[in-house]
């Protein structure tokens, strides 16, 4: 019975790892395509709009994050003792935190940009921010850098505490599995705390966009008869983008919370593989949501698909 259970776990883990590899490749293609299209447009026009800058920076940060995951998983599987040394735990935890933090905050800046550009409020504070979208985005990124510095500082303090606790028992440069797991849980806890800030900010923009759409719809019912106007359509498109971001981001956060609360399951390879698949869905699939929403990216993707479809005829 134990042999059958182990065999089932092994098969499940292998299937999940294959799915993970496919997810990483899909994410690299989507984010690489986004960055390439905007960079080519920048070279052609000699300028880049704010939203394109955010999209390019977001895609670039996710490419780095996905490559880090793609390279890191095989190394951790083939050389498990290497990744549990003091230096490697600090290096990989810090690098993952930086890559993920930057990726999440650029996506949050995109939500803030959509809100300020599309929402319609008459109060003076909103109009003041609306006229200074670039400054608002710059300040948001500056705040994210301060939080990143605090996150890394707290992260290294927790890792050092974990290392010192282990050294009191057995002086060695290698973590045994229990203390390696304990260190990972502390890293996750710290990361979840700092991720709550962009979650609250994105959720606030989402709720304010809904309120703006509701007030606009109410005004239209009083003065205009007919279907949607351009502003209403823009509201719906912005809401779709923010909903997709919040949905994928919520799944990502729930995965981290699950790993934090049920940390005993992190000893099970299938559970680790499952969490990695869920974590990777956010940076991989969100890029395709942005491609479908952006007219330039959508047209470029259709051109590439058309070229790929016609290519076999040219080869013949």
UniProtKB/Swiss-Prot annotation:
Where does the source fall among the domains of life?
Eukaryota
The UniProt record lists the keyword Mitochondrion: no
Q: Which GO terms describe its cellular component?
A: membrane
- Please give the start and end residues of each transmembrane region: 15-35, 63-83, 95-115, 136-156, 192-212, 242-262, 271-291
Q: Which residues are glycosylated?
A: 170
Task: Kindly list the GO molecular function terms attached to this UniProt entry.
Answer: bitter taste receptor activity; G protein-coupled receptor activity
Q: What is its main location?
A: membrane
Q: Which residues lie on this side of the membrane: Extracellular?
A: 1-14, 84-94, 157-191, 263-270
Q: According to Swiss-Prot or TrEMBL, what is its membrane topology?
A: Multi-pass membrane protein
Q: Which InterPro entries match?
A: GPCR_Rhodpsn_7TM, TAS2R
Q: Give the Cytoplasmic compartment stretches of this protein.
A: 36-62, 116-135, 213-241, 292-316
UniProt keywords (A-Z) are:
G-protein coupled receptor, Glycoprotein, Membrane, Receptor, Sensory transduction, Taste, Transducer, Transmembrane, Transmembrane helix
Q: Is Signal one of the keywords UniProt gives this record? A: no
User: Which compartments is it annotated to reside in?
Assistant: Membrane
Q: Which Pfam families match?
A: TAS2R
Q: What does this protein do?
A: Putative taste receptor which may play a role in the perception of bitterness.
Alphabetized PANTHER family for the sequence: TASTE RECEPTOR TYPE 2, TASTE RECEPTOR TYPE 2 MEMBER 109
By sequence similarity, the record places it as follows:
Belongs to the G-protein coupled receptor T2R family.
Q: What is noted besides the main data?
A: Several bitter taste receptors are expressed in a single taste receptor cell.
Q: What is this protein called?
A: Taste receptor type 2 member 109
> What is the organism of origin for this protein?
Mus musculus
């Amino acid at each position: 019975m134990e042999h059958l259970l182990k065999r089932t776990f092994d098969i499940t883990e292998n299937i999940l790892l294959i799915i993970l590899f496919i997810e990483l490749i899909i994410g690299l293609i989507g984010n690489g395509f986004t960055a390439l299209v905007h960079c080519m447009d920048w070279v052609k026009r000699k300028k880049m709009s704010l939203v394109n800058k955010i999209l390019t920076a977001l895609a670039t940060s996710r490419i780095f994050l996905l490559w880090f995951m793609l390279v890191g998983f095989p190394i951790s599987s083939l050389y498990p003792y290497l990744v549990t040394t003091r230096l490697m735990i600090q290096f990989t935890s810090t690098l993952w935190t930086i890559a993920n933090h930057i990726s999440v905050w650029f996506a949050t800046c995109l939500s803030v940009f959509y809100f300020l550009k599309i929402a319609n409020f008459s109060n003076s504070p909103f109009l003041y921010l609306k006229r200074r979208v670039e400054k608002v985005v710059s300040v948001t990124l500056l705040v994210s850098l301060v939080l990143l510095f605090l996150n890394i500082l707290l992260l290294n303090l927790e890792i050092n505490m974990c290392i010192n606790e282990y050294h009191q028992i057995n002086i060695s440069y290698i973590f045994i599995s229990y203390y390696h797991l304990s260190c990972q849980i502390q890293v996750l806890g710290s990361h979840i705390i700092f991720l709550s800030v962009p979650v609250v900010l994105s959720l606030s923009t989402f709720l304010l966009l809904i309120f703006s759409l509701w007030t606009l719809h109410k005004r239209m019912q009083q003065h205009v008869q007919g279907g949607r106007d351009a502003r209403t359509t823009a509201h719906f498109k912005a809401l779709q983008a923010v909903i997709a971001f919040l949905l994928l981001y919520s799944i990502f956060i729930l995965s981290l919370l699950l790993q934090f609360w049920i940390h005993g399951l992190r000893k099970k390879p299938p559970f680790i593989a499952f969490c990695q698949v869920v974590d990777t869905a956010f940076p991989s699939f969100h890029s395709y949501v942005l491609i479908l929403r952006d007219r330039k990216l959508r047209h470029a993707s259709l051109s590439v698909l058309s070229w790929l479809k016609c290519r076999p005829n040219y080869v013949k």
